[in-house]
């Protein structure tokens, strides 16, 4: 077994908390946790601690919540902990070079893609959106660039035809902690090999927007179906009927060679709501109308049949 490392962990959401949990269960010593300040959440907008903070407090690990690292005080607070390494997972704050240089072995990051593909904020969603066959996690030595650091470990898994961003998030949240603990062993015993990224293969996973999730019927059905899975659970692919936003939870592609205008309903029955697109048909199997839970297509047709008559055009 490698020697234990003195680790500072920095992260915020549940995805990060699962990695912190693996570190706590390892033989390494988590000496401090950084997470974003408590934020208002829920209907009452009550200040709420992040999942990472809650887990750290359960294990009596000191928690630090600076707004940023611009002040000398915040930088000194970090330096005083005398850490070997800082592990960063979905922290949400930019780390200046002074912070990256503070731990003896620097900072490493767990990123939700196979770098250099999908650098940036939404790698899980963009991999599904683009129709990638696989994704994974990359553990890299952090530098000042955006996900540009040398790669220390890559773990991969296939993207199944039914995977959504929600399901892939869960899969990577299981894959990442295992890869992280393995990587820490390599770092501790000096066997980790850093591999530079090929910048020519890099692309950027920009943040999702609600506007992007509005279905463009001129796209081909395959692309629309990918969007449905990529934008689940947020911001959810949607279209409009009588100015009502309808969210799409599940869809499939069917061959269609007719000449109906994209956005036109060409069939509606218990097998689905078939809509013409730029190429082939998209078939909706599960939808959500405002104020209701997601429903199968038969329930939708029973309650809102007039919205989905053959020949109607969806916006």
UniProtKB/Swiss-Prot annotation:
Domain of life, per lineage: Bacteria
UniProt cross-references to InterPro entries, sorted A to Z: Fmt, Formyl_trans_C, Formyl_trans_C_sf, Formyl_transf_N, Formyl_transf_N_sf, Formyl_transferase-like_C_sf, GART_AS, Met-tRNA-FMT_C
Enzyme class: transferase
Pfam family, one: Formyl_trans_N
EC code(s) of this entry: 2.1.2.9
Catalytic activity: L-methionyl-tRNA(fMet) + (6R)-10-formyltetrahydrofolate = N-formyl-L-methionyl-tRNA(fMet) + (6S)-5,6,7,8-tetrahydrofolate + H(+)
Keywords: Protein biosynthesis, Transferase
Amino-acid positions noted as binding (6S)-5,6,7,8-tetrahydrofolate in the UniProt annotation, renumbered to this chain: 113-116
GO MF terms, alphabetically ordered: methionyl-tRNA formyltransferase activity
A cellular component term, taken from the record's GO annotations: cytosol
Coiled-coil intervals, chain numbering: none
Function as written in the Swiss-Prot or TrEMBL entry: Attaches a formyl group to the free amino group of methionyl-tRNA(fMet). The formyl group appears to play a dual role in the initiator identity of N-formylmethionyl-tRNA by promoting its recognition by IF2 and preventing the misappropriation of this tRNA by the elongation apparatus.
Family statement: Belongs to the Fmt family.
Name of the featured protein: Methionyl-tRNA formyltransferase
Species whose genome carries this gene: Aliivibrio fischeri (strain MJ11) (Vibrio fischeri)
Chain's gene name: fmt
